[in-house]
Amino acid sequence: MEYKALIVGLGNPGSEYAKTRHNIGFMAVDALAEVAKSRKSMRFKEMGISGDFELFSLNLAGNNVLATKPLTYMNLSGKAVAAICGKYSIAVSDVYVIHDELDLPCGRMKFKKGGGNNGHRGLESIQEKMGSPNFFRIRVGIGRPEFSSQVKDYVLEEFNTQELAIAAQMSQAAIKGLNLHFRRGQGTATQFMNSFMPDLPETEP
């Protein structure tokens, strides 16, 4: 079977990271997996490479696509992406990466192709292994802590209850945006994702 694209959700493996800000990409791919035609785990060693990833086959807007969660740590994510793209002949321009973005507030997202990595180790790894920055990025905002020295701990902290509800909405918005992209093109998808605003859950008094 030929696949039109690879959707990559970035995160860290392990239950202790499941609800952390750095794992919004995993959350989005888990949401995608709920509509997947099939789900299977594949090991890099089957391709002669050490490491693991989860791989999903699904249909978006009539297109066969793959989605993956690299089960290495964030800074090695590119190994999974390069291995899958090599096996299934997917070009870097057909890779879509969903990741956390410090420079956007929680509840906002941006869709773009190429550009800088803003210090994101997962994006840097993908660019290094694929040899190009020209992949799509769905940047999901998590906000930024007050001081730069707090970033490392901040991204590994769990979302609070309100943020977790917003993250679920952002995951669904990313899925809708990808469907729009494959159905109507990049412009329509960009307009939707860049203007998306979540319904803020009510907080207890």
Swiss-Prot record:
Gene Ontology MF terms: peptidyl-tRNA hydrolase activity; tRNA binding
A Pfam short name: Pept_tRNA_hydro
Binding site for tRNA: 17, 73, 75
EC number(s) reported in the record: 3.1.1.29
Keyword tags: Cytoplasm, Hydrolase, RNA-binding, tRNA-binding
Main location: cytoplasm
Catalytic activity, as annotated: an N-acyl-L-alpha-aminoacyl-tRNA + H2O = an N-acyl-L-amino acid + a tRNA + H(+)
Family annotation (SUPFAM superfamilies): Peptidyl-tRNA hydrolase-like
Enzyme active site: 22
Cross-referenced InterPro entries: Pept_tRNA_hydro, Pept_tRNA_hydro_CS, Pept_tRNA_hydro_sf
Subcellular location(s) per record: Cytoplasm
Enzyme class, UniProt record, top EC level: hydrolase
GO biological process assignments: protein quality control for misfolded or incompletely synthesized proteins; rescue of stalled ribosome
Site (Stabilizes the basic form of H active site to accept a proton): 100
Site (Discriminates between blocked and unblocked aminoacyl-tRNA): 12
PROSITE patterns: PEPT_TRNA_HYDROL_1 (PS01195)
Similarity comment text for this entry: Belongs to the PTH family.
Assembly description: Monomer.
Function per UniProt: Hydrolyzes ribosome-free peptidyl-tRNAs (with 1 or more amino acids incorporated), which drop off the ribosome during protein synthesis, or as a result of ribosome stalling. Catalyzes the release of premature peptidyl moieties from peptidyl-tRNA molecules trapped in stalled 50S ribosomal subunits, and thus maintains levels of free tRNAs and 50S ribosomes.
The protein's name in its UniProt record: Peptidyl-tRNA hydrolase
UniProt organism field: Maridesulfovibrio salexigens (strain ATCC 14822 / DSM 2638 / NCIMB 8403 / VKM B-1763) (Desulfovibrio salexigens)
